[in-house]
A protein has these predicted regions:
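Conserved hydrolase catalytic core segment
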Residues: 124-163
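Catalytic histidine-centered segment of alpha/beta-hydrolase-like enzymes
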Residues: 309-321
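Short beta-strand/loop motif that positions the catalytic acidic residue
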Residues: 269, 276-278
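A catalytic-pocket lid/entrance helix-loop region that shapes and gates access to the active site
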Residues: 149-196
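Conserved HGGG/HGGXW glycine-rich cap/lid loop of the alpha/beta-hydrolase fold
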Residues: 40-98
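Catalytic histidine neighborhood in serine/cysteine hydrolases
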Residues: 297-312
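Conserved acidic catalytic loop of the alpha/beta-hydrolase fold
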Residues: 108-126
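Conserved alpha/beta-hydrolase "acid-adjacent" motif
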Residues: 283-289
Length: 331
């Protein structure tokens, strides 16, 4: 899950809601990556970029979705004088190829990609920074490779459980009924009996006339529910397809993890420091998951509930909490 798809391209894109988001001047300057590359992973070519200071503290930015991809705005969260920031587009996302591809695209594949990327860049350990699905993948990678992680900054916690997916598909719309009506009205009455499978079938259809409208309904629904202040937002094009198709692909496969895998294995990473930042009014990833994670983690985890925010990285309170956490880890 992400919800940041239409927001990362520009802060305060809607002038009526501008004050709800961090001001442009409060982020770090726009900087070009000092290096770009691709990992050859067989069917998949994984795009990555590096920015900031080459000998700075290594941090890996893990985007949401699955399928949301990275944006130049994401680079602006990281102090270029203190961090060596690595960003990458997960399989099927952003500039990685093939776009929207679901074959050989599992959580285990993504974990392996991260580890290959770390080895290729010669990084011993790195800080993991991920929100929404990015928090899921960060946690799954840390559980698989705890010795390679120096700490975690997590936002909008999604633990990849069936209950959370059911909430997204059936209950989130109680708070954003207009967006939910647009989401389910694309399906026939019969198809609404299993929303996930019905959307998955359409999103996997090779014909653009079938998969693209479904993708835009799905991505627009999620993005419209991403902030405390409501706003109907339309997401179109390639980004809508990768986000919707890959989310449905992962959800129909239980995120390729045993149910409750993360909390059942939290002991593996309990020794690592973590900052967990959660919008109190996040309806995409409700606060109960962040609360459960922090409770299971113990005293090495700090949970900060942001009372005046929803799900988006760039909402004012969340963005400032993320910047503060990055300052602490940079010391």
């Amino acid at each position: 899950m992400s919800g940041d798809l239409s927001l990362a391209a520009g802060i305060g894109y809607d002038h009526a809601m501008a004050h709800a988001f961090i001001e442009d001047k409060e982020l770090f300057p726009v900087l070009a990556p000092f290096a770009k590359g691709r990992l050859d992973r067989g069917l998949h070519q994984i795009y990555y970029e590096q920015c900031g200071r080459p000998n700075g503290k290594p941090v890996l930015f893990i985007h949401g979705g699955p399928g949301a991809g990275i944006s130049p705005t994401h680079r602006r969260l990281f102090n270029p004088d203190r961090y060596h920031c690595v960003l990458f587009d997960q399989r099927g996302s952003g500039q990685s190829l093939p776009h929207g591809e679901t074959a050989q695209n599992t959580t285990q594949d993504l974990i392996a990609d991260i580890e290959v990327l770390r080895q290729q860049l010669g990084i011993e350990q790195w800080l993991l920074f991920g929100g929404s699905w990015g928090s899921t993948l960060a946690l799954a990678y840390a559980i698989a490779h705890p010795e390679r992680v120096s700490g975690l900054i997590l936002r909008g916690i999604f633990l990849g459980t069936r209950a959370e997916v059911d909430w997204f598909l059936h209950d989130m719309g109680r708070f954003f009924p207009e967006a939910y009506d647009q989401f389910v009205s694309y399906l026939t009455v019969e198809e609404r009996g299993d929303i996930l499978l019905s959307y998955h079938e359409k999103l996997m259809d090779p014909q653009a006339l079938v998969h693209q409208p479904a993708a835009e309904r799905w991505a627009s629904y999620e993005t419209s529910c991403s902030t405390l202040r409501a706003g109907m937002r339309r997401v179109t094009g390639r980004s809508a397809l990768s986000m919707a198709r890959l989310e449905a692909h992962y959800f129909v496969n239980d995120c390729f993890m045993p149910n409750n895998h993360i909390l059942q294995n939290i002991k593996v990473i309990r020794h690592l420091p973590a900052h967990i930042i959660q919008g109190r009014h996040d309806v995409i990833c409700p606060p109960v998951s962040a609360h459960r994670l922090a409770d299971a983690w113990g005293n090495r985890a700090t949970l900060r509930m942001v009372d005046d925010a929803g799900h988006s990285t760039f909402e004012n309170g969340i963005a400032h909490a993320l910047l503060s956490a990055l300052d602490e880890f940079a010391v």
